[in-house]
From Swiss-Prot:
Keywords noted in UniProt: Ligase, Nucleotide-binding
Protein function: Catalyzes the activation of phenylacetic acid (PA) to phenylacetyl-CoA (PA-CoA). Involved in the phenylalanine metabolism. Can also use CTP and UTP as substrate.
Entry's EC annotation: 6.2.1.30
Source organism (scientific name): Pseudomonas putida
Organism lineage: Bacteria, Pseudomonadati, Pseudomonadota, Gammaproteobacteria, Pseudomonadales
Entry protein name: Phenylacetate-coenzyme A ligase
Amino acid sequence: MNMYHDADRALLDPMETASVDALRQHQLERLRWSLKHAYDNVPLYRQRFAECGAHPDDLTCLEDLAKFPFTGKNDLRDNYPYGMFAVPQEEVVRLHASSGTTGKPTVVGYTQNDINTWANVVARSIRAAGGRKGDKVHVSYGYGLFTGGLGAHYGAERLGCTVIPMSGGQTEKQVQLIRDFQPDIIMVTPSYMLNLADEIERQGIDPHDLKLRLGIFGAEPWTDELRRSIEQRLGINALDIYGLSEIMGPGVAMECIETKDGPTIWEDHFYPEIIDPVTGEVLPDGQLGELVFTSLSKEALPMVRYRTRDLTRLLPGTARPMRRIGKITGRSDDMLIIRGVNVFPTQIEEQVLKIKQLSEMYEIHLYRNGNLDSVEVHVELRAECQHLDEGQRKLVIGELSKQIKTYIGISTQVHLQACGTLKRSEGKACHVYDKRLAS
């Protein structure tokens, strides 16, 4: 059911108000174009399609996409840097790349049309979150090869907002500018927003004296408990933006302010599937699995059935006719196997945030003790709970240990530390320190 206000209807793109049938017809036409574009211009796709016995002309309905092969991050690395580009080099106006923590980075390219599409979907995302022309947007995503900063920047400008291009880091200065410039919206990772919230409190600033009303958070998974914590501490609406560089960057999906029930996928540009991460079988909507995207409008770097490794489910549309992404429970490649139990860091986070005496900061340390895994969870007391005596602290430790055992099924050693002890992030947070191989 569409829940936008009639007064805002004129602001929406036509596909945001289209019928589901019209959307599916648009997707079919764009899929045919995208598959042919990839097949005609990228040798890897031509080879893979042939190996599967598939040809772009075989796509007669959306379900036929399952006949085509998957693409993964390793394909981009194996064809580094430009082997998967589908246009001549002179048509590529922008290059971005992943951080490349292991091996070669993944390189993504954009034509001018791609840049325009990207700006449009991010502008649509900010508007869906409640942003409007004339709002001031404080961008704390990193600028540079990372797509977050520039993606947010050009989308905000396309919407007609005033952009404050702060980038990451310099936390004290960030807060100074938030106080002085009075932005309406902040775009940042949720973990760094916690860092900024701590600094706002440290400087004695009342959040009600700030003009911030919206936080658009992405680039890492976060829980509903963390959302509530941020909203309560800062008095803002916290919304989830989803994206990945290989598909476009931020702006692939965006939570809508009307419903705040998970990011709406901009399905006129990105076609989603959910698959079994082991077998590759396409799963029905509503079932948990790995999210896969096929680009529908990208020129420089078309992506066919790209495996994101994000574990989620597809849900019916609410604020828009497009489907939504359920809360991402983790990644198929960051799942921890601890004494035979599959564990995702976000599951630990959920339990930490249920305990009112604890801050949002946590670390998971994994060791090998003989033939067994040993798990330590390091957490912090909130600043206002520093006065707790030893007995009270033991109760907090016991409560967290019990909850993790009950809800996740593993035994842990909980280490309770003073407020401000754990490392703060200026970008994507690192919560897991796996030292089992070194043990």
